[in-house]
Amino acid sequence: MKKIILVGRPNVGKSSLFNRLAKQRIAITSDVSGTTRDTNKAEIFIDDKNCILIDSGGLDDSNELFKNVKINTLNEAKNADIIVFMVDGKNFPDEIDKRFFYELSNLNKPIALVVNKVDSKKDEERSWEFNEFGAKYIFNLSVSHNLGTDELRDWIYKLIPKSKIKADTSDDFDEFLDCVNEHGEMGLPSVDYETKNIKIGIIGRVNVGKSSLLNALVKEDRSVVSKIAGTTIDPVNESYVYEDRVFEFVDTAGIRKRGKIEGIERLALHRTEKILEEADIALLVLDASEPLTELDERIAGLGAKFELGLIIVLNKWDKDHGEFDKVVYELRDKFKFLAYAPIISVSALGGKRVHKLYPLILEVYKNYTQKMKTSRLNEVLEEAIRTHPIPRDHGKIVKIYYGVQFGFAPPKIALIMNKPRSLHFSYKRYLLNKLRENYELSGTPVILIPKNRSQKESTENEN
């Protein structure tokens, strides 16, 4: 079985990428340098191929402990088959990274240079500087926002042999898909989204005005408002009825930089994540009077992580409309992964424009829970494919036979194909854009899953 090792200096995102590729939270991720000192290993599947993924300790010469970690890491790299060398895209290349990269390149193994934390246009421009490493394979990633990982997975996939073990293709999903195919839309779960309470988490860093926004939304002083950062530790729940729908608002604890989180706030952060697991929509509150920060981006990533409907709320807004357009442009550049989220400006303390959030929440929730008729969905897909045919895979035709919605909140669509591995991420993005052109999908993510039609049949034939 092929071994793939993730290598790099401390705090470049190795453990986050390990968790992303392993699709489970095995490694501890933190902003503290050197969190991973021992190697973590997991057997993983890259689609239908299995391999051993290794998360190594950080390469660092700063003290005796880290020197030992570095020696262990280099020994692991010698025994690995594929090396993924990671650097921090927020910084310019330096000689230490180059030295480590060249040392690993001399092992004569397939090696990729991964520039992580590329979250904006500015980061993309800076990433060009890493071409001076002379790496044959370079990938720009934002692991925290799950951007660019598909290309890296494709590269790894081509380097590992086909597995003799069948990957877990999720029997529940296959059975569910069979049910949809047999019974059409009637086979989908019957949740009464038109009457259930809408759960809304209010998220943001400390002191951006989340509690003021909650008070303005429910029209009473339920949450303590203070200039002292971090006044809200326990989540604050409040309900409000609008057009016969119950909105359940939760003002979550403000989130600080990880290095500043103390014990009680760590618990509050854990509670915030638990709340978001149960939520339908997140209101991401940003302070319009301050520049956007990396922490804002990380918190925004929580909305994407939990696949929530999302509205970006610019609080403390006292600028004119021309300024709004400028701020929106900057936001869209920084938060590319939230391109679907509507943006609204408010002044929570003064109650300005807060009332516009109620209909917007209803609109986003409707989009988030909508059912797409299979016939209409396939008309849209067929038109998209006619306009821009699916690129071939090494001369072989790639086909989408049909699409079917298999989940809601958010909409989840299976693309039944002959070669799901061959659907390039850029074409997937093209299909998503076409769906957004033809459906009301503002405020909601849409999940597309390529699925092999013969996968289940071939498994049954082998038994």
From Swiss-Prot:
Biological process annotations from GO: ribosome biogenesis
Binding site for GTP 1: 8-15, 55-59, 116-119
Protein's UniProt keywords contain Repeat: yes
Cysteine disulfide partners in this protein: none
Domain EngA-type G span(s) in chain numbering: 2-164, 198-369
KW Cytoplasm (keyword) present: no
A GO molecular function held by the record: GTP binding
Quaternary structure note: Associates with the 50S ribosomal subunit.
Family: Belongs to the TRAFAC class TrmE-Era-EngA-EngB-Septin-like GTPase superfamily. EngA (Der) GTPase family.
HAMAP family in UniProt: GTPase_Der
PANTHER family assigned: GTPASE DER
Described function: GTPase that plays an essential role in the late steps of ribosome biogenesis.
Protein name, as recorded: GTPase Der
Organism annotation: Campylobacter fetus subsp. fetus (strain 82-40)
